[in-house]
Design a protein with these regions (language model features):
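Conserved helix-turn-beta segment of the N-terminal RecA-like "Helicase ATP-binding" lobe
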Residues: 98-125
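Extended alpha-helical interface modules used as scaffolds for assembling large macromolecular complexes
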Residues: 1-35
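Conserved RecA-like ASCE P-loop NTPase motor core of nucleic-acid helicases/translocases
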Residues: 90-97
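Conserved motor-coupling elements within RecA-like helicase/translocase cores
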Residues: 123-133
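Hydrophobic positions in the central parallel beta-sheet of the AAA+
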Residues: 68, 93, 133-135, 162
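Conserved pre-motif I regulatory segment
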Residues: 34-69
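Walker A/P-loop
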Residues: 62-87
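SF2 helicase catalytic motif II
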Residues: 138-169
Length: 169
């Protein structure tokens, strides 16, 4: 039809930026793929999401994506776990270092139905790809002879959710 414009998926971001520059904000309704199913339940043994954590998880999910900004100690990891449970899919979590990655793993084991065997570590020390994989930014961005050998992790599974931890805007 004459009113339809087809845009190559790789150009979506650039077109949205150009429209914004001329004062036309664009709402991208292209949607997301569901990813590989992997059921995750939040445990409810002696704790529950705080109201603001539930609101953050619901808002993230309603928009299909987003950025969760909370102060230190407010439970961003728990909000991430709630988003994972809502997605019910394989998840890649990118963290700043292995200490943060192991904290994620401890919290996920304590607060969700995930077992140790379902959570992999992809770092300088280990290269485990599992239904939930926690990778460090450092290993993902390692470049050897002009090639990023570890970026294949992004394509190794049909990730239903990717969480970027400690992203500073």
């Amino acid at each position: 039809d004459d009113d339809t414009v087809i845009v190559h998926p790789s150009e979506r971001g650039r077109i949205k930026q150009m429209l914004l520059k001329i004062g036309w904000p664009a709402e991208d309704l292209a949607g997301y793929v569901d990813g590989e199913s992997h059921p995750i339940e939040l445990r409810q043994d002696g704790w529950e999401l705080r109201d603001y954590q539930q609101l953050a998880a619901d808002s993230f999910w309603a928009g299909g994506s987003g950025v969760v900004v909370l102060p230190c100690g407010a439970g961003k990891t728990i909000v991430g776990a709630a988003a994972m449970a809502k997605a019910g899919a394989t998840t890649l979590i990118l963290v700043t270092n292995t200490v943060a990655g192991r904290q994620w793993k401890r919290e996920l084991i304590a607060r969700t139905s995930l077992t140790e065997e379902e959570i992999g570590e992809y770092s300088g020390a280990k290269k485990e790809i599992r239904p939930v994989t926690i990778a460090t930014y450092q290993v993902m961005t390692t470049k050897r002879q002009g090639i990023y050998p570890h970026l294949e992790v992004f394509d190794s599974r049909d990730w239903g959710l990717i969480i970027y931890d400690e992203v500073h805007l």
